[in-house]
């Protein structure tokens, strides 16, 4: 069989270049056939070449889409998606009075091959309610999970485990990466920040001039953060923030 070698092929618009039977076409030193893909700088810019064992094609670098769950629901695998990176964070614990703040939810992350999976149920843990005084113990946040693959428990509320203490952070499990959420602050004479999670810490704290600062701004905090405490006993702390499940989708 003979070879035709060229570094450039030109054809008029709408025309076809025919290679005679018995000849191979070599473009830039590479023989082209039904399993070869000539590079197109304009169409394939920013992509990489991937093979499924039968044929090769150009694909995008990085995730092609992201599914975010701020409430529980079902993730359905989009057509052509083969792998995902899943991130889960548990709900934050609520703040109590006297600066005893809630802890952040734990965090887990995992790479999952989803070629044999059609759907997975995602559970998003709620943020817990806040309290006042020593006896108004902030509740613990809820657990977030991606099916049975990975999960992250919620942070505990201020004054929940021991009196005068901040909450204990939640913990991720089942992932390639599993970490604790940040703990809450203990008793003091001003507001204590809510525990910091993977996405950041609780809302602002303040002194006596703005006693309701934490409560009034409790939604201005990232997912999974612990609730900032109230100033002194009678002022209610901030609720813990709900968790989240984030699915980054790759071809």
Task: Please provide the spans of the model-predicted regions.
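Extracellular repetitive beta-rich solenoid segments
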Residues: 2-62
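Short hydrophobic/aromatic-rich beta-strand motifs
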Residues: 36-38, 45-50, 85-89, 220-224, ...
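Glycine-rich strand-loop-strand elements at beta-sheet edges
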Residues: 68-70, 74-78, 85-148, 165, ...
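Hydrophobic residues at beta-strand termini and immediately following loops
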Residues: 69, 152, 223
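Acidic, glycine-rich loop-and-strand cores that form catalytic or ligand-binding grooves
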Residues: 150-218
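Outer-membrane beta-barrel transmembrane strand signature
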Residues: 215-229
């Amino acid at each position: 069989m003979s070879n035709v070698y060229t570094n450039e092929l030109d054809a008029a618009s709408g025309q076809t270049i025919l290679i005679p039977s018995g000849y191979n076409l070599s473009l830039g030193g590479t023989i082209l056939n039904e399993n070869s893909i000539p590079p197109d700088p304009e169409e394939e810019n920013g992509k990489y070449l991937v093979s499924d064992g039968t044929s090769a094609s150009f694909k995008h670098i990085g995730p092609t889409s992201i599914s975010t769950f701020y409430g529980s629901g079902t993730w359905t695998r989009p057509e052509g998606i083969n792998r995902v990176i899943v991130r889960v964070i548990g709900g934050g614990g609520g703040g109590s009075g006297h600066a005893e703040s809630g802890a952040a939810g734990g965090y887990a992350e995992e790479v999952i091959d989803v070629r044999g999976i059609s759907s997975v149920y995602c559970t998003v843990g709620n943020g817990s309610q806040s309290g006042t005084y020593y006896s108004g113990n902030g509740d613990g946040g809820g657990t977030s999970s991606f099916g049975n693959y990975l999960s992250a428990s919620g942070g505990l509320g201020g004054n929940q485990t021991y009196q005068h203490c901040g909450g204990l952070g939640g913990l991720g499990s089942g992932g390639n990466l599993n970490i604790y959420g940040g703990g809450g602050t203990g008793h003091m004479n001003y507001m204590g920040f809510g525990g910091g999670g993977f996405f950041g810490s609780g809302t602002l704290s303040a002194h006596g001039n703005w006693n309701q600062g934490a409560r009034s701004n409790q939604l201005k905090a990232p997912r999974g953060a612990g609730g900032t405490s109230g100033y002194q006993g009678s002022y209610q702390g901030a609720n813990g923030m709900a968790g989240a499940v984030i699915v980054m989708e790759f071809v």
